[in-house]
């Protein structure tokens, strides 16, 4: 048991560190290729923050633990919508950007509802996954099309990424090291989490919805809390809910096209909770485009109640 717990701790550490290194290297290469900063921010940096979820879910699906793969995504998204937004609002009331209310939250809601419908038969087929990925391409097109209007925000989000040019050889090294750590760490993490679930008599779905989801989402929580303290909470909530869209449409889309997934432990309650959590955030965001501290407390309480119901 202790060895498996060590696998989980070391695995998540490698995944998080590897994702950071891979993103740094990829951004440096993109800058040397004269790729526009806004495109870097909306693609490489955004995808880099979801790389832990991607690798853990992808490896889980390949190993035949579909509940762990989907549980990680569903749990991470609930974590993002309820705990990250809730705790950030408790730290400081959140002012929400109009584009988040009008585009990001509705798209996250549609993606979550679509996932719920697709899982009614207990499977995510290649066709289902293909539909999700096509939706991601549409979302990216809409995002890049509106990038000129959000240019200042995007520059701020990636501020500092290219201040010190990185040598090409070092960029390549970081990309390779990042990939190795992501793959190796994901394998350790999945092996440890699966073994712990077996030893405790807990389903892989519950482990995915709690330990795995929480572990892969910790960087977003830390970043959002710091952003809230510095008065940049609007960017934090946009990133959290934008990550929800990427997690469902891209991670489950790509993973499902490669290896269809059969769900056993992920229930309609879990998927419905995902939809409800985003609906609550959307409802709160309409009050003067702000989420107050009491609303943050409600979101946090709902998250705690949900996790308690799983245990």
Predicted regions and their residues:
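Hydrophobic alpha-helical segments, chiefly the membrane-spanning helices
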Residues: 1-311
